Amino acid sequence: MIRRPPRSTLSSSSAASDVYKRQEDNPEVIYAVYSSSDYSFHGIYKSIDGGDNWSLQSNSPNILGRDTDGTGTGGQSWYDLSLGVSNNDENHLFVGGINLWESTDGGANWTIEASSGNGNYAYMHVDQHCLEFHPITNVPYAGNDGGLYKYLDNLNNWIDISDGLEISQFYKLGLSESNASRLIAGAQDNGTEMLTNGVWDAVRGADGMECAIDPYDEDLLYSSSQYGGLRKSFNGGNNWDNIKPVSYDGAWVTPYKIHPNNNNMIVAGYDEVYLSLTSGAVWDSISYNVSGGQSVRTIALAPSNEDYIYAATYSRVKKPTNTGQSWTSIKPGLPNYNISDVTVSDNDPNWLWVTMSEYNASNKVFESSNGGATWTNITGANLPNLPVNCIVYQANANEDLYIGTDIGVYHKDNTMSDWAPYKNGLPNVVVNELEIHYPTNRIRAATFGRGVWDSPLNSSSTYTNYNIVNNLNIYPNPASNRLYVKLKSSDLVHFEIRSISGKIIKEGTLAYNNYIDVSRINSGTYIIKIRVGNSLYRQKISITQNSR
């Protein structure tokens, strides 16, 4: 057991975070790094008698701060603080905070070793969490928010050896309804990543947060950075426009949603709820003091009715009582715990569920069938006593629910009396968001530390395009006069042709093997939506007209 340096040994009683490391070749040698109450460098201490006595080695420069020259105040040792001691040289140390620092004289003097900036030091991702020397080779390794790094002595450099490790810390993800191989996800310290046909590409920097893909156009992307830096791309992530509705910050993960049946409608939560009916070009505040001074943490939209919007802070859940700025609290009846997520039935705007991110075994998931007037606790007895981070509703006959917890996914439907694990093959990992890809009947999970995972749904949805896609033929493409819609069955076909911005250009109903007259539609790229019963299919089409 290591005896910590007594407070009388420290230069101040305000020391905060700390980390200890014993030297392998001489276990009597122990180092301790302390941070101050503002998370700056408080000091490094050394013991040569197994922890009975300690001496201060140094308390400057500020090796836990952001500045690579050690000036400045503060740091973030509450999040990143690490210490490594060479196995065969007790005076060779590394300390990691935001950056990585090195000492070769037992902590008396320090030089910057690595950071993410440009300077006279090696490149390394910021936020250092662990440091270890290999027990045989004595090669140092560093683990940070960017992955795992190894020191190359012959090059005096650090290299990223994370390739192939599925360790991204994702907060949120967005799926493409029209392209099953595309998704976009926001990662801690690694920006916004986009997956297309099995290949990941970085499309934005900073800390990646909430993401979305337009349901009609896979190249129309939305992403956000920390505190609500909301942006939009029209060309698959090559360029981004700022569409943030306010100049000030929202929550760390600021919520926003695109309405599933109206891609022009976006709702975002900052201090208030903001609505855009122009895909983010123009915003209006639609609430007043809805957050009570807090930041809105989650937004839920009712697919069946655009007037139903639910917004929640950690301690409040509200919905609008009309299309104006009057909102009603629906928190009464819920326990006084942090709210993590809200989801709404696809068919009934008053049927919703709320989850709690608390360590309280009996208060995890709540259901309301009357718009929050009353609540039913559906936590059951099988859930682990860990935070529930997210919930998603599957529109089908069994009314499946899926929740993401700190150790994976759990599932319940209307035939089950309690929740059951739904994580075969999934590591025990924090699941921050779940989204359903209806065209392929699959569910995808954004995890904090193990990347993005994919699984078949428990039961098929009636809302899937694969019932018709193999029997459907839309031609010619491009078209000029007639666009033929051929279906092997004799079912009635409902169609919509929309502009890329979502405006309905033409809609109607077709009988078996018929065509749409597009002769009066201007040349351009459009989205055609075909609905047959409960099945839906979307496709890009081009219309080319001769000069007239």
Language model regions located:
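Entry beta-strands of beta-propeller and related beta-repeat scaffolds
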Residues: 26-32, 89-94, 137-141, 179-183, ...
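Asp-box/BNR beta-propeller loop motif
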Residues: 14, 37-66, 99-124, 145-168, ...
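Active-site lining segments of carbohydrate-active enzymes
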Residues: 35, 50, 60-92, 98
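C-terminal outer-membrane/trafficking sorting elements
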Residues: 467-475, 479-548
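Surface-exposed coil/turn segments at beta-strand junctions on protein surfaces, enriched
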Residues: 25, 88, 261, 304, ...
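A recurrent domain-boundary module in secreted/ectodomain proteins
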Residues: 432-462
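Short, small-residue-biased leader/transition segments that mark boundaries at the very start
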Residues: 4-19
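Short coil-to-beta transitions that initiate beta-strands within beta-rich domains
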Residues: 14-17, 66-86, 116-134, 161-178, ...
